[in-house]
């Protein structure tokens, strides 16, 4: 059964490691050294719930409803475009240091609310956890399924805590205005690239739906 665990770790890592809204938020909180470990924990716990729901039944529900899948897909496109626009707008700000200072004034509960929005209101997360991980893990028998789920969840915990700690360690170099501008441009461009790729999949899905 241990092989299913490592399959889960490998696939979970492949899904979690690419830059996305969650990773960008955890990284930025680590750079600011502002509740970064708490945010990493909440992200990992959110993934635990989403991955478990996807593998143990949620995937079948989503895949059996083409219109719901289309809604999630295009919702993901809109969310990623909006998030990318925000990052690029921050990067192009004439006074990036002032903008960063304003962010640093945010309280714990506002940061938690932002993290929950980035995770739970991001339809792209449901595609990863329900469609990809859920469809693969859902095909397994119950015991291998549990090990597979444990592997994907382990990858999530290791990644988010590792990212938060690494960002905090590199904070002196990454907190400069130049570094922040580069990071925000990178985040914005990647979000838009993912959105366009998802839009292509959405168009193909809609074409199949109407034919």
UniProtKB/Swiss-Prot annotation:
InterPro entries hit by this protein: Arg_export_ArgO_enterobac, LeuE-type, Lys/arg_exporter
Pfam families xref list: LysE (PF01810)
Subcellular compartments: Cell inner membrane
Topology relative to the membrane: Multi-pass membrane protein
Positions of transmembrane segments: 1-21, 37-57, 68-88, 111-131, 147-167, 179-199
Substrates-to-products reaction catalysed: L-arginine(in) = L-arginine(out)
UniProt entry keywords in alphabetical sequence: Amino-acid transport, Cell inner membrane, Cell membrane, Membrane, Transmembrane, Transmembrane helix, Transport
A GO term for molecular function: L-arginine transmembrane transporter activity
Signal peptide: none
GO cellular component entries: plasma membrane
UniProt keyword Phosphoprotein present: no
Main localization, broad class: membrane
UniProt cross-references to HAMAP family, sorted A to Z: ArgO
Family as reported in the entry's similarity comment: Belongs to the LysE/ArgO transporter (TC 2.A.75) family.
Functional note: Involved in the export of arginine. Important to control the intracellular level of arginine and the correct balance between arginine and lysine.
Name by which UniProt lists this protein: Arginine exporter protein ArgO
């Amino acid at each position: 059964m241990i092989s299913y665990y490592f399959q889960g770790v490998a696939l979970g890592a492949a899904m979690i490691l690419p830059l996305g809204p969650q990773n960008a938020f955890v990284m930025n909180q680590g750079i600011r050294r502002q509740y970064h470990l708490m945010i990493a924990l909440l992200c990992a716990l959110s993934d635990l719930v989403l991955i478990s729901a996807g593998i143990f039944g949620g995937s079948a529900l989503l895949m059996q409803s083409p219109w719901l899948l289309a809604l999630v897909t295009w919702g993901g496109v809109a969310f990623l475009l909006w998030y990318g626009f925000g990052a690029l707008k921050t990067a192009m700000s004439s006074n990036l240091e002032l903008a960063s200072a304003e962010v640093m004034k945010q309280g714990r509960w506002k940061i938690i609310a932002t993290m929950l929005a980035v995770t739970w209101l991001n339809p792209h997360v449901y595609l990863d956890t329900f469609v990809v991980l859920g469809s693969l893990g859902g095909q397994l028998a119950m015991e291998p399924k549990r090990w597979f789920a444990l592997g994907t969840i382990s990858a999530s915990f290791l990644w988010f805590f590792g990212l938060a700690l690494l960002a905090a360690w590199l904070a002196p170099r990454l907190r400069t205005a130049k570094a922040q501008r580069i990071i925000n441009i990178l985040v914005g461009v990647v979000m838009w690239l993912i959105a366009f790729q998802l839009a292509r999949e959405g168009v193909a899905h809609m074409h199949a739906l109407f034919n």
